Amino acid sequence: MATTPDAAFETLMNGVTSWDLPKEPIPSELLLTGESAFPVMVNDKGQVLIAASSYGQGRLVVVSHESYLLHDGLVPFLLNVVKWLCPCPGAPIAVHSSLASLVNILGDSGINALVQPEPGEALGVYCIDAYNDALTEKLIQFLKNGGGLLIGGQALNWAAHHGHDKVLSIFPGNQVTSVAGVYFTDISANRDWFKVSKEIPNLRLYVQCEDELEDDQQQLLKGMSEIYIEAGVIPSQLLVHGQRAFPLGVDNSLNCFLAAARYGRGRVVLGGNESLILNQTMLPFVLNALHWLMGNQTGRIGLASDMKVLKSMLPNSSFQWSESELLTSDLSVFCCCSLANIDSEEVEEFVAEGGGLLIGAEAWSWGRRNPYSSCMTQYPDNIVLKRFGLGITSHVAQRGSFPFPNPEGTNYHFRRALSQFESVIYSRGSSLHESWLNKLSQDCFYMFQMTHQRISIYDSVKKHALKMIQSKDFPSVTEQYPIARGSSQAFLLSLAYELFKSGVDRSQLLPPPALLPPTESPITIKISTDNDNSWVSTGLYLPEGQVAQVLLPSEATHAKLKVLIGCHRDNISQARTYFRPPVMTYVYHLTSSQTSISWLYGGLLYIMVPNKYNQDNVSVTIRGAVSAPYFRLGKTTQEEWKNLITHSKAPWGELATDNIILTIPTVNLKELQDPYPLLQLWDKMVRAVAKLAARPFPFQRAERVVLDKQISFGFLHSGYPIMGLISIVEGIISEFKIRSHGIWGVIHELGHNHQKSGWTFPPHTTEALCNLWTIYVHETVLNIPREQAHPSLNPELRRQRIKYHLNKGAPLSNWIMWTALETYLQLQEGFGWEPFIQVFADYRTLSGLPQNNEDKMNLWVKKFSEAVHKNLAPFFEAWGWPVKYAVAKSLASLPEWQENPMKRYTAEGTEGRE
């Protein structure tokens, strides 16, 4: 028996070389929404005319016109269908009287079939048209128990008499086939051209058929004008991806936090947090939701323990309640905050056969606990919710007040939006709004998580996305050819990235590569516990489009080692204009003895070593990459360096000491004939940084500085690595320029890296304290006095800042940046650098440090006063610090600071704080 969609398709199409259809009948396009459903016959417009699926233990084939089942030209295919549907050899084949002549067609081919008014108790195959509404329950149970059902029909005539928007929900055939995720629609299908596919054909992204979803939306939101998500409630964003799923509540960025769906004969309402349901302000919505979920049913509403408060919240309702953790047969609706403890097949069948499901849950906390897991396929609730066309994501929605309904937000739907973008790509439609494109990018991230299981409704999305990339070629973005955020090109970049992450081979995304540099002999890097929590440079570069192999011992496959391709870590997606791709790095987890690695943009290679790494002397071998310029102080010889910069084709290289590593464009490195004096100077500067911070030296993890064409903000920012624009390259690789002009920016960022929360008072000192390191390095290493190191430290400007601050009454709101720095400069000029080193060292030994600024500032007053053996309370009070009475009293026994520089300003008549 064929057990996978691919095997089933092969069985159904065995020996079928052409589609011979009658010309007169007008078929209905079929809509596929179920995970088990797949197309069998698709026309040149992408419309499905024949589909197959399964439900419970049984199988189903749906044909878009009943006359096709009586057409001699389809006999070879019909024989395959009966064979595939038959649960076991010799099982009975029965035909409803509406298709009586099918008995003769099958008989002529040696298959015995009988006309029967309904399926018999013995499981076999039953053939029927799609217009019978008396056998619905029997057909569903026959299918569920293991029978094979062949059904054909079209809904066009029915729609003309009963309403186009009712077809999906009420058309008799859909009452049966919908449980397996297949629908007859009110759309006529093109009959002109059919191609026999060798593999499962692709589905359209979105079928523009009429539905009741707009009416459903209105019914669910009746009486609601807005929703207020209060502080403390953090809802997850929801992915609304099924054709019959729709958003209800969205924030200002189109992030959905409340949604609903029809699935089979049942309905689902989903909130991105249980508080969106278990909240008094949401009672009107909850009442609407429960009535909508009940539909025409009369059973009880089941309440899981985490939802039983609903009963007391709705004391005057006419509902019959039942507290239950299980989906019992007497329930019409089930309410819960988690589906983790209920079998997913049970939940799917409950909804498919008419049940209603109300659930409120978030996944952002799960995402934080499982950062490398697939939210859509591994988060327990999503295992079943994704079948309903919904998903709970690990991203959070905004909080605040949002209108109900929001036309722009509730009109956005993932499949519809991607389909519209596809029309733009093929010049068949107008461009999408930037907000839709931004939302689409994020939704693709989650949608592509579901495309590893060969499920047509998911795989088809990936295939369409890949075809868009291939039709327009891979987007190139450079300084000469920038791309605007929100443009079609920007979305294609994002789409390519998400496709690559989902497993699409880079050869399907990138154009054929130019002649690649020859690969080097395998390089082996030793990883030890000394590399704990760091990136280990390999001195190798992986060109774009090239594949390398990473090998490591089997005992190291659980060590959580990773390979990082590229070091330009800033995600610049929020920039208005891109001068390079928004995401330039990619990480592979080394969980097997051999890992193939590649990346759309190539990059320098690093081994990422986790925190608390405990395996020593592990050999990691890389083959298939090329050497990059890499000079390590004390190891690389002058001759080796000259050879590297002469012959390397890698665009980036590195200059390294044990304490700092600089990533520089190769074109700039070629001008550096001897990096030794430069790196000696850098080592002296970072030694000074460590000394002031009272940190051990050499560093356990070297600081990193990476230059880039474009970074996330500013021209430099702190972090690991420190990121800076290429325009500053001369200022960091020229020993002469550093010694003569200083290097304020990078040392400023190093200062940020060494600031500690306990003695930083945001926002006042965030950009002030870090400058202590710049001044210290300039004065103690470069012999550049502070007034020359930065123009803002001109003595007269400093005096003016102090006077201005005091004339305003020394408000704390004014004590920021250069004004805040002045306080520390006065302390340094009065007592030298040693007290700072001592106090920073003391802070490293303290536990239970205060978290608010006032308490942190008072601790600093106390600590610094004790370090210099002076009562500094009056000094800090003059600056406007909120010195507490108890702290001032505890310091009163210390000698007065006679040289307090603030006295000079008060003596001049400036009003200071008492």
Curated annotation (Swiss-Prot):
InterPro entries: Class_I_gatase-like, M60-like_N, Pep_M60_3, Peptidase_M60_dom, TCAF. Residues 533-832 form the Peptidase M60 domain. Prostate-specific. Present in both dorso-lateral and anterior prostate. Belongs to the TCAF family. May act as an autoantigen in prostate autoimmunity. May play a role in the regulation of the cation channel TRPM8 activity. This is TRPM8 channel-associated factor 3. It comes from Mus musculus (Mouse). The gene is Tcaf3.
